[in-house]
Regions:
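Acidic, low-complexity interaction regions
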Residues: 1-171
């Protein structure tokens, strides 16, 4: 069963990577780089609980093993993406249809601005900005109908709202 051993090793590495990403989320949160998107309030509650439980204060040496143990449940559901990350919960995932097997998010049907599992960080801003700029370039041309221009303008407004908090935390 050499293939089974390899698959297990790959799965273990994936799980460790997911946990590393969640720890990075937590550390960024402690530095004031708060996540955005619909899942952010749930994450902030989790992170506040971890901080309060561990007494994670500036200048204090943190027990990394205990931190990773407390965040492990988030790592199991994390799916890292280009435009957003998903802390996948099949019960609330907007990307799933009734006939889907809820093993993972369906990225092509993701609604980052509406799904309660969606979370964005500062690393997601650049692709959203690029998409907004592409839309603005299209709006400058004269090849689109009035309806298409309205749709692109509305979509750009939606994208701006989605990343506003990440670009200016006071928003």
């Amino acid at each position: 069963a050499p293939h089974g051993d390899f698959r297990r090793a790959v799965e273990q590495e994936r799980a460790l990577g997911q946990l590393d990403d969640v720890v990075a989320y937590y550390e960024a949160y402690l530095q004031g780089d708060e996540p955005g998107g619909p899942a952010s309030s749930r994450l902030k509650q989790e992170f506040d609980h971890v901080r309060d439980t561990l007494g994670d204060l500036p200048g204090r040496i943190l027990d990394q093993k205990r931190l990773r143990t407390m965040l492990a449940h988030l790592g199991k559901t994390l799916h890292v993406g280009f435009l957003n990350d998903c802390f996948f919960d099949p019960a609330s995932a907007l990307c799933l249809r009734s006939d889907d097997r809820p093993a993972a998010p369906v990225i092509s049907r993701c609604s980052p601005d509406r799904c309660p599992n969606s979370c964005l960080t500062s690393r997601h801003v650049a692709p959203w900005r690029a998409s907004i700029e592409d839309g603005e370039r299209l709006l400058q041309g004269n090849t689109l109908s009035a309806v298409q221009k309205v749709a692109i303008a509305q979509d750009n407004d939606r994208k701006r709202r989605l990343i506003a908090h990440l670009e200016d935390p006071k928003v």
